[in-house]
Amino acid sequence: MDSSTSKECAEIAHAVGGNEIVCSKSGSVAVERFTGPQIRKFAKTDPDSYAQTKTIHLVSSFFASIFAGKTVAIDHGDGAGMNLMNLADLKWDQDLLRATAEDLSEKLPPCAPSNSKSGPISHYFVEKYGFSPTCETIIWSGDNPCSLIGMGAASPGKVVISLGTSDTLFAAMPAPKTDPNGFGHVFGNPSGGYMSLICFKNGSLAREAIKERYELNWDSFEKDALSQTPAGNNGSMMLPFYEPEITPAIDTGGPVFSSDHHYSSGEAVRAVLESQFLNMRTHSDWLGVSPSRIFITGGASENDGIAQVISNVFGVSVDRLDVPGSATIGAGMRAALGMGEDLANLESKFSQPKEGRTLEPDPTSHQTYNEVLPKFKAFLAEQFTS
């Protein structure tokens, strides 16, 4: 991820009155990889080329324009990841545009709802590749908004947790609510409304570290080590931040343990999992949406022990998703939505969880985690003052 625009992020934030204002307007604090700071850097380092630039597209709107044979709009989903669009009215925010670069409002396509039609396909594709001249196109979106659709989580209450090197939480939102701490991001939901994306850097990175340290395989990680300890781990916690974490933004210089005693393999395995998902629960509370069901995906989702801890921490059913290429599937579903298809019908065909793999929360364990959560938050807060 490009982090070369930290100076530009600071300049944009200063110009509008601080990162709190940037976040309240755009859904995210000024982020180095987002389009706005990148445009500002381009305008500063090569002002002549910027002045000669007629139109600035995202990759999504650029390719949509190629298919339509004309400049088309940037959708609300991808447009929200630019630090330029106002979440309240879903239009370019003039304060952010002025803070970013001169005459930027003249260089951007308009914003539009994600399922807007962009017209018939270009004659080029009809003549060269045999597309039907009656083929309609819709504007494109980004990979994360399309994944939300493809995973069947476009309605508030359905939460997706993707377990990878970094763990990511996706959720639809009925209203544009922003993270008061600035860790999470808010984008437009392609099916209408809004969506959140919260990334936790130390995902499988931390789980792998514990597995290797105690010379476990994934089977023993689940069946042996995890079964040795009760929910709550008898008070033994850890912050598994092997790399500087981004949610919350803290560098602890490595993992931090709540106790000086030597952790057994069972204690360490449970500590890393409980801490990861208690941290996830803590830093998704601002969404204001209680999950009714959680879908998990990614390699670690196949591990029943990990899935059960998620179910117990959040207190809801957990399903495994079987949607390979969810962004691609979601893009196809978006095209169908643009042509008038019903979302629920599309989800029933393309976004179903694996049969017979649902895990239900254990009420006693969930109550234990409700009692542990304040202690975990206090343990985490100590690291910001130490």
Annotate each language-model stretch with its function.
Residues 6, 13-27, 34-72, 83-102, ...:
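Active-site core segments that coordinate phosphate-bearing ligands/cofactors
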Residues 79-81:
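A short, flexible beta-alpha/helix-coil linker loop
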Residues 101-113:
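A conserved helix-loop-beta module that forms one wall/lid of the active-site cleft
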Residues 2:
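Carbohydrate-associated surface elements
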